[in-house]
Regions:
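"Short basic amphipathic alpha-helical interaction patches in structured regions
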Residues: 36-38
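Short helix-loop-beta-strand segments that form the rim/entrance of peptidase-like active sites
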Residues: 1-34
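Metallocarboxypeptidase
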Residues: 41-194
Length: 194
């Protein structure tokens, strides 16, 4: 963002020919909580739910990266237990954060060509699919575009990033933002773990 604003003259075509949408923090309450209380917190801070195992402990939040509608709730890496870090929520888009982002994208689905989300921890660029060990038909195109991003980071920072599907590099998981059905019209959908 800073480069686009402060160094506009370097690449004016990037400003003049493209509409840019930035959402600096998609989970503001979770972000604040991770800075004030628990630095590894990844969920939202939505209302407390009773622990399903014991019924006494109050558990907060939903993992926004398991709350998207595409194959929501499938597999073993999104939990129905509100006390786990990967709790998917009671239904897809149950969280106002994920619902707002999905609505924003849907109203611009014919305009948005690239959807990039920055995620915390690791040095990976993940492209779909994450919910299964298969690649979508546009995988090669996404891979080539993402590879350019990885190479640019390498050139500037000297940092190596792994590139592949979440299923290849991590594990299969459903309800992820980069797999979300609202993003299926984008030419590039990936998550950069920084």
């Amino acid at each position: 963002m800073l480069q686009l604003v402060e160094f506009r003259d370097w690449h004016p075509e990037l400003i003049d020919s493209v509409d840019w949408y930035f959402m600096p923090v998609a989970n503001p309450d979770g972000y604040e909580y991770s800075h004030s209380t628990d630095r590894l917190w990844r969920k939202t801070r939505s209302g407390a739910k009773a622990d399903q195992r014991w019924g006494k402990k109050k558990c907060y939040g939903v993992d926004p990266n398991r709350n998207w509608d595409f194959h929501w709730g499938e597999g073993s890496t999104s939990s129905s237990d509100p006390c786990t870090d990967d709790y998917r929520g009671p239904w897809a888009f149950s969280e106002p954060e994920t619902k707002a982002i999905a609505d924003f994208i849907l109203t611009r689905k014919d305009q948005i060509k690239i959807y990039l989300t920055l995620h915390s921890y690791s040095q990976m660029w993940l492209v779909p699919w994450g919910y299964k060990n298969e690649k979508p038909k546009d995988y090669y195109n996404m891979y080539v575009l993402a590879e350019k991003g990885v190479e640019a980071l390498q050139a500037v920072r000297g940092t190596d990033y792994l590139l592949g599907t979440a299923a290849e590099l991590l594990y299969t998981s459903s309800g992820m933002v980069s797999n979300g059905s609202v993003n299926l019209t984008c030419k590039l959908r990936c998550t950069s773990h920084i």
